[in-house]
Amino acid sequence: MKKIILLASTVITLFAFTTLTNWKSDKAHSQLGFSITHLGISEVNGSFKNFDVNITSSKDDFSDAVVEATADIASINTGIEMRDKHLAGPDFFNAEKNPRLTFKSTSITPAGKNNYKLAGNLNLNGVTKPVTLDLWYRGTIENPMSKAPTSGFQVTGTIKRSDFNLGASFPAPMLSDEVKIKADGEFAKQ
């Protein structure tokens, strides 16, 4: 009987230390943005208005986090409606055929205090490629309004649009091949 109680206690203790916690992005305090160089002399910025990001982790420092993100391509916003429609069309993202972009992390590796390399698979325009992004964990506080634990993150990196068949008829220097990604977010513990 003592062995059964000891075994049960061990299992419960191990489960308690490996419980996964879900964190959901606070849309009012999060953004998924990008920038691209135009004609080699200026930056054009944009974002996706409709997106979701979820993080699952069993550690307080998020060193074992799994990040999953989706965005509606048709929600692309550069501030110019005509350009947004062109970007959502077949020359670039082809939102009708590929309505969402997705990202799912495959690993997270420490890269200094509160910094990580976030590797994962990005599916964009029907093409899936591995990417590695920089993740900065900005800390966790108790949100004074909701009283919920809230964590902040920033993700940055660069992808090549040619890897995802985006705008092939618009070569550099008209549009740079490199697209900078910048996402900022607050995440509430669920």
Task: Label the predicted regions.
Residues 1-24:
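Bacterial Sec-dependent N-terminal signal peptides
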Residues 17-190:
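Low-complexity, acidic/polar, glycine-enriched regions of mature
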